[in-house]
Amino acid sequence: MSEDPSGSPAGDNTHAPESVTVVVCAYTLDRWTDLHDGVLEAARQLRESGREGRVLVVVDHNDELLAKAGELAGPLVDVIANTHRRGLSGGRNTAIGFADTEVIVFLDDDATPEPGWLEHLLVPFADREVLVAGGAATPRWPDGAARPVSLPAAPSGRGELDWVVGCTYEGQPTTLAPVRNVMGCNMAFRATVFDTAGLFGEDLGRVGRVPYGCEETELCIRVTRHHPTAGILFEPRSLVRHHVSPDRLRWNYLWRRTYAEGISKAAVTERTSHQASLSTEMSYATRILPRGFLRELLSAPRTRGRGLGGAFAIVSALVMTGIGYVVGHIAIRWRRSKQSRREQKGNPR
């Protein structure tokens, strides 16, 4: 890839995408206000961009929400039902089958785009070698709530554990930069990627409120495997505000989410390779987390003990992720062993 000094892709192979589909997958009426605002803002930015395309709302096996979402349908917005397996990956794969544009953008149903979001997200695709681009997400706390002790923040304003609530975290790039994978709440793919690398793994990712993940990580690793010289870029100027529901401020959500992340990482490792699936995580665990732990610990005297809570959050999150990772590997190997025994019984020599 070639870039000019300003960080914008440049060169003889530039080609800005002329068409885009923005996909918003939804599963619950509890997020109706966020869904409504996000879809309308995405449609507004798409219209102002002058590009061909649509906003596609995919409802995940919820007839009541499907009927309500019909209110969003209009000249630039279509509403369809998930025809694949229940879950976020199935909804995204349904949308991929409907889209007929150069680029497919994925926006979470509780994320609201900031001005310039879409244009900044599409800038990297001016370089034909770029196949995937992702933007940033900043938390929008519940009304009247502040950042909880369980999600300590660095001086940059980002928290080491903000990924737990689907937001950009400390250690991620602050300018346009290559990354291993993008974040699911704000990302875009060239449509041709799905022809070569395949779709989202439907046995990965969220199903309703079950906080599994890593489906976009696994897909990005597959993209790199099929296209070794292709670009996957992070563009932090493409920004969404990600709503954080009150239940995600609690300690038990931190532990449930990090445990589930460990299980998801184990699944990705089994599908890809240890090096590919954990390269980013090793740097994060050995550089970013220790620095955050020390910062919180040293701040305890002047923060009336709040820093102790932050330090505990970082350690406990790492421990729960590790436990989930081990449990995930054990479960995968047990299922494989069970399947092997079944096959042997069904094919006696």
Predicted region positions:
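Short, flexible, basic/aromatic active-site loop/helix in glycosyltransferases
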Residues: A154-V179
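Active-site-adjacent helix/loop segment of glycosyltransferases
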Residues: A230-A317, T321
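Short beta-strand/loop segment that forms part of the nucleotide-sugar
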Residues: R51-N62, I80-N82
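Short aromatic/hydrophobic "clamp" motif used to bind/position activated sugar donors
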Residues: I104
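Glycine-rich, basic loop-to-helix element that forms the pyrophosphate-binding segment
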Residues: N82-A99
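A short, conserved alpha-helix in the catalytic core of glycosyltransferases
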Residues: G184-F189, V193-A197, L204-S238
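Short, well-formed alpha-helical segments that are part of the catalytic scaffolds
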Residues: L29-L46
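Conserved donor NDP-sugar-binding/catalytic core segment of glycosyltransferases
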Residues: G116-A154
